Amino acid sequence: MALTIPRSQYVATYGPTVGDKVRLGDTDLWATIEQDFLTKGDECKFGGGKSVRDGMAQSSTSTRDNPNVLDFALTNVMIIDAKLGIIKADIGIRDGRIVGIGQAGNPDTMDNVTPNMIIGASTEVHNGAHLIATAGGIDTHIHWICPQQAQHAIENGITTMIGGGSGPADGTHATTCTPGKFNIERMFQACEALPVNIGFFGKGNCSMLEPLKEQVVAGALGLKIHEDWGATPAVIDAALKVADEMDVQVAIHTDTLNESGFLEDTMKAINGRVIHTFHTEGAGGGHAPDIIKAAMYPNVLPASTNPTRPFTVNTIDEHLDMLMVCHHLDKRVPEDVAFADSRIRPETIAAEDILHDMGVFSIMSSDSQAMGRVGEVVTRTWQTADKMKAQRGALGDEGNDNFRIKRYIAKYTINPAIAHGISQYVGSLEVGKLADIVLWKPQFFGVKPEFVMKKGFISFAKMGDPNASIPTPQPVFYRPMFGANAKANTESAVYFVSQASVDANIKAQYGIQKETLAVKGCRDVGKKDLVHNNATPEITVDPERYEVRVDGEHITCEPATKVPLAQRYFLF
């Protein structure tokens, strides 16, 4: 006989279900569950007097030799995902990959158990009833200035870091390039202990092909062109020729000073080939004042970096000082001051907010320690979304913010994965992908995860005093867990590399332990493939007033005087 209970009691026991609204942090963003995959009355819950026990929701007969038995079951969890939507389900993990989104349990005693989601004696279980699961974030603009960035990134929910550098050298301070085989090899060896997936850009600034090819063979997953090395048409053409031949992506920081041409000349050199543009608004660098127009082209995958996200009353002042440091400028040199002033434009930064909300800008990233904060990609994304809701209203949803939420989460999960040919491995919680999962309490969403899983094993978590009698006493702060230790770490994270380097067996050459996974399909994508962020309207910029127009309409917004997910979360 069925038992009817009040919705409030159900939510208190098993978490929200279809129609329930969940507030994200202290933002004004509300997510409503669209679909619930769980069978009412057969929910899996672990604990004293609960259902996950022998002969009930846990099978008594299934051994791990049965390929349908899970290694880890995350039960009753709310999922926010750019591809799956906003749903309620159990997540099944086996061999470090997601094998099921559905109903876990014991098919001998329960109805509607997803066939490959059996809970057995070999299954670890975590109650997700009052948590939100998201895919691990992907940051595609990493200056590898110091290895400690990885810990700060994972503590904000970033599990994949793509960029370049070799430590605190001037070249790395300014550009995201790991130049040449020697440096690439050393960086692979140096990053074995880091708890995140990693990919390196080779230096793309060369007008001849062979010096570029050898870096791809050495393990670069792509090439980075930067104006400080000379972003000339010849360099752009050469890098894209190599990328087309070897199936890797090209990222570009274009020519702020317009030394070798204007935006139109750069687009002519690109010649319709796919390219990933960094800080496409321009404050981080790029053709002044109209690099923002690049976002209208169907072959351009446009990204932002987080120091301009969102536009606030402090943005302009902060940027001038950052720029002087990162690009080795001198306030006593008039030309250097003019260079800085040309890049920092309130009008285009304001427009960037709106272009994100319209789905014209597709990717969010950090620019770590080089005019960006590596531990704030996720936070800045949701601050931007909240600011846009306050200033522009709803995006056509009926009583919730689901579409806006899916648009914004795509910017740091699936879209950077698509841009760099790794979406078959990461970027969403779809079946078959690496179990890189971030768990959040709703009130801390976007700021401080509960824990982060890498390939199905807990890597980092908020943890209390290890000498306490229970896990929760203060001081509570992020600590590396077993998944970030010793050989478990090298088994729980991967390197993303070129197919040419896999064929060259760099894993054996370099003596590295982490799995190397080849990027694929980098040259076949376009703006049309980016999830919820594929708009290509006509964009114009007034060369004197810097006003930005989209399809003829002037777009601008006021700077924020306060943002959510800020000081109240960082008192301690």
From Swiss-Prot:
Binding site for Ni(2+) 1: H141, H143, K224, D367
Catalytic activity, reaction form: urea + 2 H2O + H(+) = hydrogencarbonate + 2 NH4(+)
Positions annotated to bind substrate: H226
Gene Ontology BP term (one): urea catabolic process
Cellular compartments annotated: Cytoplasm
Regions crossing the membrane: none
Post-translational modification: Carboxylation allows a single lysine to coordinate two nickel ions.
Taxonomic superkingdom: Bacteria
UniProt remark on cofactor binding: Binds 2 nickel ions per subunit.
Modified residues (N6-carboxylysine): K224
Co-factor(s): Ni cation
InterPro entries, A to Z: Amidohydro-rel, Metal-dep_hydrolase_composite, Metal_Hydrolase, Urease_alpha_N_dom, Urease_alpha_subunit, Urease_AS, Urease_asu, Urease_asu_c
Enzyme class at the top of the EC tree: hydrolase
Keyword check for Hydrolase: yes
Catalytic residues (UniProt): H327 (proton donor)
EC number: 3.5.1.5
Disulfide bonds: none
Family that this chain belongs to: Belongs to the metallo-dependent hydrolases superfamily. Urease alpha subunit family.
Name by which UniProt lists this protein: Urease subunit alpha
Species this protein is from: Actinobacillus pleuropneumoniae serotype 5b (strain L20)
